[in-house]
Amino acid sequence: MSSSHKSWNSIYEFTVKDINGVDVSLEKYRGHVCLIVNVACKUGATDKNYRQLQEMHTRLVGKGLRILAFPCNQFGGQEPWAEAEIKKFVTEKYGVQFDMFSKIKVNGSDADDLYKFLKSRQHGTLTNNIKWNFSKFLVDRQGQPVKRYSPTTAPYDIEGDIMELLEKK
């Protein structure tokens, strides 16, 4: 992979590790609308976000929505667990069936390249840094980040934008 984010053209160029440590090429999401979210299990927003994300997954996976969740411990140490514990928690408490990935960093020089790309394409307010857990990026069927949402924006609040992209074939 190139070290310059200017050469990245879509999310399909990235390979990430899933929650079990297995390499996953994001090419597998080609043709789908993706919602990419940095998550944490011990955040005040955990319950609302995981419940809404899972419910949306259940309803919209058949229409082409894919939710990609990336645990991150950069905000208040609210994702301290190892991947096996994270997986157990979200599966048992929320019945999570959407795709969970290994813990990453989303800010700083050692941020995951996928997040460097997302932030370069959809800038934040005041700063490009991810501000907290449950920041969201909406990616179209061509692998292009088209919208960025703040951590306080609930999944249900962006459903209209998701539906608009799902209706575009």
UniProtKB/Swiss-Prot annotation:
Classification via InterPro entries: Glutathione_peroxidase (IPR000889), GPX_AS (IPR029759), GPX_CS (IPR029760), Thioredoxin-like_sf (IPR036249)
CDD domains with a match to the protein in the record: GSH_Peroxidase
A single GO molecular function term of this UniProt record: glutathione peroxidase activity
Keywords assigned: Oxidoreductase, Peroxidase, Selenocysteine
Active-site residues from the entry: 43
UniProt family annotation: Belongs to the glutathione peroxidase family.
Catalyses which reaction(s): 2 glutathione + H2O2 = glutathione disulfide + 2 H2O
Entry keyword annotation includes RNA-binding: no
Superkingdom per UniProt: Eukaryota
Entry annotated with the keyword Transport: no
Lineage: Eukaryota, Metazoa, Spiralia, Lophotrochozoa, Platyhelminthes
EC number: 1.11.1.9
Name by which UniProt lists this protein: Glutathione peroxidase
